[in-house]
Curated annotation (Swiss-Prot):
This is D-arabinitol 2-dehydrogenase [ribulose-forming]. It comes from Candida tropicalis. NADP(+) binds at residues 32, 53, 185, 189, 218, 220. GO terms for molecular function: D-arabinitol 2-dehydrogenase activity. It is an enzyme of class 1 (oxidoreductase). Disulfide bonds: none annotated. It catalyses: D-arabinitol + NAD(+) = D-ribulose + NADH + H(+). The active site is at residues 170, 185, 189.
């Protein structure tokens, strides 16, 4: 590369545009995906939302499109992308494979970005944790992360395409949030973080990047309901965060766009990006 090309604007300044790319988001009707899907649409992507409840996911898709039509009118050179809704249990490997294949066929292209926000937490003292519950949370949070990554990567490898996988971990994957009794959730998220590292090493030769985004406390609608009327709980949680507040969902958008962009994060793989307001620094 000659000197003039190396120092050109397009070569030095990363682009966060996702024009024409198909992005699959699991947990598609959740609070985090609501803001992320809007940001991705604004960057030119087509989006496929996946969740267990098809009706809620379809409504989420309609909401994203309506937002795009209202907020992006006259601000976007390209037409607004497509947004589709799908129902799938990510803990079911066969269902995941069929759904991802149907998504690619529906949109007429192979998805090149996967954001796995699906998963859940629950509280049980370790000595009382029901075996059935323990198995299910590992199936959804752990195996589900693998199943969606596998189904996403296969057509990319077959078509010699690059891609980016973003698995949502948690600060609970590296620390224990006292006093919450969530041993199986913690175990599942620790597994997600190491799964991303393992897949990053295996799929680097295919130019498929795999990273984890690990949030701290997020003020999703679910979290707001949990702390509503429990001022002492909110105060206790925030007292353990150096920034002394919980995160708004929009504060994760920049990290998602960075990891999704082939230009911005082309040499970033196997990384666990922690966005927790400094919680883990104590």
């Amino acid at each position: 590369m000659d000197s003039s090309s190396y120092w050109s604007y397009d070569n030095i300044v990363p682009s966060f545009r996702l024009d024409g790319k198909l992005v699959i988001i699991t947990g598609g009707s959740g609070g985090l995906s609501a803001v992320v899907s809007r940001a991705l649409l604004a960057k030119g992507a087509d989006i496929a939302l996946i969740d267990m409840n098809l009706e809620r996911t379809q409504q989420a898709a309609r909401d994203v499109l309506q937002w795009g039509e209202e907020q992006m009118k006259g601000k976007h050179e390209s037409p607004i992308g497509q947004v589709s809704a799908w129902s799938c249990n990510i803990g079911d490997a066969e269902a995941v494979e069929l759904t991802f294949k149907a998504i690619n066929e529906h949109h007429g292209k192979v998805a090149s970005v996967l954001i796995n926000t699906a998963g859940y937490a629950e509280n049980f003292p370790a000595e009382e944790y029901p075996a059935k519950n323990a198995e299910n949370i590992m199936k959804v949070n752990g195996l589900g992360s693998f199943y969606v990554s596998q189904a996403f990567a296969r057509p990319l490898i077959q078509n010699n395409m690059t891609g980016s996988i973003i698995l949502i971990g948690s600060m609970s994957g590296t620390i224990v949030n006292d006093p919450q009794p969530q041993c199986m959730y913690n175990m599942s998220k620790a597994g997600v973080i190491h799964l991303a590292r393992s897949l990053a090493c295996e799929w680097a030769k295919y130019n498929i990047r795999v990273n984890t985004l690990s949030p701290g406390y997020i003020l999703t609608p679910l979290t707001r309901n949990v702390i509503s009327g429990h001022t002492e709980m909110k105060t206790e949680w925030e007292s353990k965060i150096p920034m002394k507040r919980m995160a708004e969902p929009k504060e994760f958008v920049g990290s998602i766009l960075y990891l999704a962009s082939d230009s911005a994060s082309s040499y970033t793989t196997g990384h666990n990006l922690v966005v927790d307001g400094g919680y883990e620094c104590w």
